[in-house]
């Protein structure tokens, strides 16, 4: 593994919260915390933008992917819309997390709660090569379940 230095600014409403951190030695994602002033109650079916109190500057060639936490999804039906959310290297605003409650019960987001995870990833920029036909493949144009449902 290579450590990558990422510039981060703590915004005033998140200054007292810990920085995102990896929960275990081999974790790919860092946990993002809710920088809410007061608890936020998400009713079933509701979505809200939750602040993190952080702004970042990623190196060229990197993005940050904001992803749901599996425990919140399984136990409470809490997920992220626009998942994974992409934070581009040239974005300098606050990192926000769009939480959605797909569960049957209201869910309370409290200050400092781990609400999402952030994965830092390299990316490639593509250039289109317009051709008259595409090369053949075993799959062809089959999609949307065309490979079956059984292993």
Swiss-Prot record:
<comment type="function">
    <text>This enzyme is involved in nucleotide metabolism: it produces dUMP, the immediate precursor of thymidine nucleotides and it decreases the intracellular concentration of dUTP so that uracil cannot be incorporated into DNA.</text>
</comment>
<feature type="binding site">
    <location>
        <begin position="69"/>
        <end position="71"/>
    </location>
    <ligand>
        <name>substrate</name>
    </ligand>
</feature>
<feature type="binding site">
    <location>
        <position position="82"/>
    </location>
    <ligand>
        <name>substrate</name>
    </ligand>
</feature>
<dbReference type="InterPro" id="IPR036157">
    <property type="entry name" value="dUTPase-like_sf"/>
</dbReference>
<feature type="binding site">
    <location>
        <begin position="86"/>
        <end position="88"/>
    </location>
    <ligand>
        <name>substrate</name>
    </ligand>
</feature>
<keyword id="KW-0378">Hydrolase</keyword>
<dbReference type="GO" id="GO:0006226">
    <property type="term" value="P:dUMP biosynthetic process"/>
</dbReference>
<dbReference type="InterPro" id="IPR029054">
    <property type="entry name" value="dUTPase-like"/>
</dbReference>
<dbReference type="GO" id="GO:0046081">
    <property type="term" value="P:dUTP catabolic process"/>
</dbReference>
<comment type="pathway">
    <text>Pyrimidine metabolism; dUMP biosynthesis; dUMP from dCTP (dUTP route): step 2/2.</text>
</comment>
<keyword id="KW-0460">Magnesium</keyword>
<keyword id="KW-0479">Metal-binding</keyword>
<protein>
    <recommendedName>
        <fullName>Deoxyuridine 5'-triphosphate nucleotidohydrolase</fullName>
        <ecNumber>3.6.1.23</ecNumber>
    </recommendedName>
</protein>
<dbReference type="InterPro" id="IPR033704">
    <property type="entry name" value="dUTPase_trimeric"/>
</dbReference>
<dbReference type="GO" id="GO:0004170">
    <property type="term" value="F:dUTP diphosphatase activity"/>
</dbReference>
<comment type="similarity">
    <text>Belongs to the dUTPase family.</text>
</comment>
<dbReference type="InterPro" id="IPR008181">
    <property type="entry name" value="dUTPase"/>
</dbReference>
<dbReference type="Pfam" id="PF00692">
    <property type="entry name" value="dUTPase"/>
</dbReference>
<dbReference type="GO" id="GO:0000287">
    <property type="term" value="F:magnesium ion binding"/>
</dbReference>
<keyword id="KW-0546">Nucleotide metabolism</keyword>
């Amino acid at each position: 593994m290579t450590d990558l230095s990422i510039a981060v600014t703590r915004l005033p409403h998140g200054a007292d919260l810990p920085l995102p951190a990896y929960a275990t030695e081999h974790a790919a994602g860092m946990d993002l915390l809710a920088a809410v002033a007061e608890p936020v109650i998400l009713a079933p079916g509701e979505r809200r933008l939750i602040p993190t109190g952080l702004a970042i500057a990623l190196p060229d060639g990197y993005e940050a992917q904001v992803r749901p936490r599996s425990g919140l999804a399984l136990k409470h039906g809490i997920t992220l819309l626009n998942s994974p959310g992409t934070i581009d290297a040239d974005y300098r605003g606050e990192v926000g997390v769009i939480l959605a409650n797909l569960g049957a019960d209201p869910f309370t987001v409290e200050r400092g709660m781990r609400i999402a995870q952030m994965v830092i990833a390299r990316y490639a920029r593509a250039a289109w090569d317009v051709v008259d036909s595409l090369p053949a493949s075993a799959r062809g144009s089959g999609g949307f379940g065309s490979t079956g449902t059984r292993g």
